[in-house]
Amino acid sequence: MDLQSHIRSIPDFPKPGILFRDINPLLRSPEAMAEVISQFGRICDQVKPDLIVGIESRGFIFGAPLASDRRLGFVPVRKPGKLPGEVVGLDYALEYGTDRLEIQADALEHSPRVLVVDDLLATGGTAAATGQLVEQAGGCLVGFAFVIELEGFGGRRALPAGQPVEALLRYG
């Protein structure tokens, strides 16, 4: 299936000069969604995770069905104040400031093998921070899977060296 035909390019959104890659047509297509989950499943076959970690919020859209399909657990990584109970958090640098991600403190007990899933890899800052958070919380990071990679932003360079990084679609 041609997943690229399910991605809409919207010029000048959210501001002039930006070419936005809209995944909503893909989300509306049961066949395209099934193909994404199938291709992510092949990545799981390679890296053999015990858990899928999804990055807020679109990582949830792809990570939860992948986990269900592969009979794996799913763990959300969220912005501050969104998870109940004790959390482990990590502050990370943005272009203009900082942000924070959190995971429940007991989510990665027993050092599970973790695949991080999200919709988009651009600068890599959020994904890299998620990988650090997984390890800080006791998990064993085994790779990253993205629907789209915007190669011009160099996000792969921000991710840990030696970790598998897979993107189903790449744009320059």
UniProtKB/Swiss-Prot annotation:
Which cellular compartments is it found in?
A: Cytoplasm
Q: Does the keyword Cytoplasm apply?
A: yes
Disulphide linkage map: none
Q: In which pathway does it act?
A: Purine metabolism; AMP biosynthesis via salvage pathway; AMP from adenine: step 1/1
What superkingdom heads the lineage? Bacteria
Signal peptide: which range, if any? none
Q: What is its EC number?
A: 2.4.2.7
Q: Which GO terms describe its cellular component?
A: cytoplasm
The answer to whether the entry has keyword Transferase is yes
Q: Recorded GO terms, molecular function? A: adenine binding; adenine phosphoribosyltransferase activity; AMP binding
Q: Record's PANTHER family?
A: ADENINE PHOSPHORIBOSYLTRANSFERASE
Please state what the protein is called. Answer: Adenine phosphoribosyltransferase
Q: Which organism is it from?
A: Synechococcus sp. (strain CC9605)
In the record, what lineage is assigned to the organism producing the protein? Bacteria, Bacillati, Cyanobacteriota, Cyanophyceae, Synechococcales
What gene makes this protein? apt
